[in-house]
Amino acid sequence: MESLPRRVALLSVHTSPLHQPGTGDAGGMNVYIVELSRRLADLGIEVEIFTRATTGALPPAVDLAPGVLVRHVTAGPYEGLSKEDLPGQLCAFTSGVLRTEAMHEPGYYDLIHSHYWLSGQVGWLAKERWGVPLIHSMHTLGKVKNAALALGDDPEPTARLVGEDQVVDAADRLIANTDQEASELVRLYGADPGRVSTVNPGVDLDRFRPGDKRAARESVGLPPDAAVLLFVGRIQPLKAPDVLLRAAAELIAREPERREKLVVAVVGGPSGSGLAEPTHLHRLARRLGIADVVRFVKPVDQTRLADWYRAADIAVVPSYSESFGLVAIEAQACGTPVVAARVGGLATAVADGRSGTLVAGHDPGDYATAVAGLLDAPHRLADFGENAVEHAARFGWSATAAATADVYSRSIEDLRALRYRELCAGQ
């Protein structure tokens, strides 16, 4: 690729790649940014990640990996700001980004890649100042989320919806996680189809790989003969962990003998620090009469998470909205079949009927039926596990980085062509 950028400014305002996934606002996007940046660096592209400083304990710049630098930008108080408060800090954040670039020779950054709409607002202004292409990844779409709200969940604010429209108009190219997201950008936001590229996220196939289930269960403290259902993610209405708990209660109500061996593991934390106890789920488990089968586990690092995937019989992903669903791919890479909602990118992440089962809607009874259909058919469960590994192998991060770098190259070439046409027109 002749037009490969030398250096990219990658913007992630609201969540740092150094944060533990599963805590606060840290999740799949954090994993995405870390892994993509590392693989881009492997291709010879330097990456500088700008993120809001949330503690004074870290230096202004931290080396994440060879060729990958994390820059902490002071914008508002370190603590006490929710994601919804951050629009008020975008001017300060943008100022910090522009000051950093001004310390270098002009043309220091060849391209901007912003992640989530907040970062897109910053990228829009930086693009105008620096005269470089802006690539934007939404990760989630406010209009899509509002169309599929969970009970008790708050709708995305108008500021976000308007901000997303602005970013779609400003970006030179948009990267969608799946073809469905690409079509939603065109249909709901009026994006030019020629400026939308689909690049599937990836999975670390070295870390997330099949292994000995008995050893994994011993590692995480689970009985060797248990029937283990696993939920991984932030504990919030959007991710619908309550659907899994209600499905487990339905399983036991249908067949009380399942209680003896059933284990439901919930790995993750609520918004905020992510380390608080999910008291509402504890109460729900008690009310459903299944507190004895549910285990709540605070967020764990990626290596430990792989053990949880390998220890599980089935990973359950009942989200109301997912632009892709990294949890589903990670679980499958470890050889664990998935029962997931038929929403968004999960239809791409899961090979329905081969590596898992997609469920229409969020009726706990339907999830109970899907789970029982695998637990009660060991040969089918094993076949799904083998197929899951094969399916996940298509989603390595190196392929994601190569496709992303191609989008970068085309954007740089487009800008050069535009400038050449303008030069010719002015002569």
From Swiss-Prot:
This is D-inositol 3-phosphate glycosyltransferase 2. NCBIfam families: mycothiol_MshA. Catalyzes the transfer of a N-acetyl-glucosamine moiety to 1D-myo-inositol 3-phosphate to produce 1D-myo-inositol 2-acetamido-2-deoxy-glucopyranoside 3-phosphate in the mycothiol biosynthesis pathway. Homodimer. Gene3D superfamilies: Glycogen Phosphorylase B (3.40.50.2000). Mg(2+) binds at Y309, R310, A312, T336. Its EC number is 2.4.1.250. Keywords: Glycosyltransferase, Magnesium, Metal-binding, Transferase. It holds the Pfam family Glycos_transf_1. One of its GO terms (biological process) is mycothiol biosynthetic process. It catalyses: 1D-myo-inositol 3-phosphate + UDP-N-acetyl-alpha-D-glucosamine = 1D-myo-inositol 2-acetamido-2-deoxy-alpha-D-glucopyranoside 3-phosphate + UDP + H(+).
